[in-house]
Amino acid sequence: YHSKSSTKLVAKGIHSTIYSGELTCLLGANGVGKSTLLRTLSAFQPKLDGEILVLGKDIDAYSDKELSTTIGVVLTDKCEIRNMLVRELVGMGRSPYTGFWGKLSKDDKRIVEESIALVRIEELASRMVHTLSDGERQKVMIAKALAQETPVIYLDEPTAFLDFPSKVEIMQLLHHLTRKTNKTIFMSTHDLELALQISDKIWLMDKANGISTGTPEDLALSGHLSNFFARKGIVFDKDTGLFRIDNQFSRQIRLVGHGQKYAMVRKALQRNGILANREVESNIWIETGDLKTTHFIIHETSGGTYITQTIEELLAYFDTEKS
């Protein structure tokens, strides 16, 4: 993009397609240019070179009126909206069709109600916008974009201010909407784990290597994901297709058991620098039992046993042993 004194090149050599009926997530570090790319794709700012085709037509050939009925945009900004009902805000999505006075026709009102129903916020429709939580407000903005009836919707970090359950709900909602409406939905996000589990396609944006695209699984198999996030302390687990913390282990302990208790003990020990699994050979070992048992058994080097009721007590045992 152009600034007053220079031209800033954010990314080049992008050759990719965003498809209808799919949720595509744009991932990248802070400052890499995700928002700039979204603004360019939305025609909010001019591209420096190349072409952007929307439904087979160059974006520069669209009039403002045509763009308003082709591309809907949901931004991160938290606007303070007062004295407006949710239904009225969703109705503003119909502004490209209502003319100067903005009066909703019977058909416009039907589309507004359908958009509210698609996002499942019927119980919020008569609430004042300023009384909503961040998650509820984000749903309303998505409903507004749906009411705009554009085949393409761009979202700039729609989960940025949400708690984890709300993040999951918004991501699942967007994925559901791509299937239900066959719209093209493209969003930037920092929620890596959710994007890998829910999105259909991923765009990895990196200053050094440009943009890599594909399904999360293909990017995992090709090594793009592990290379993209390669840094100390983070490891891409090829078995799960997700990232995990790369703990540095100071000792190893054999762990016997199965199910949830085994997994939770293993996780707690690894967080505390102890590699624990069934394959490890050690003089001391831990028996986790299953959910029917209420304790954990530590088999000591001396041949004796030490029983703990909680994982916290189990960790304290090894802290005491170290000291």
Q: PLM features: residue spans?
A:
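Conserved ABC ATPase signature
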Residues: 103, 128-132, 136
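Helix-to-loop junction immediately C-terminal to a conserved catalytic motif
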Residues: 42
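The feature captures the beta-strand-to-loop junction immediately N-terminal to the Walker
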Residues: 27-29
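Catalytic Walker B motif of ABC-type/P-loop ATPase nucleotide-binding domains
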Residues: 153-157
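Conserved ABC ATPase "signature" region
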Residues: 91, 106-124
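Conserved ABC transporter NBD signature motif
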Residues: 50-58, 67
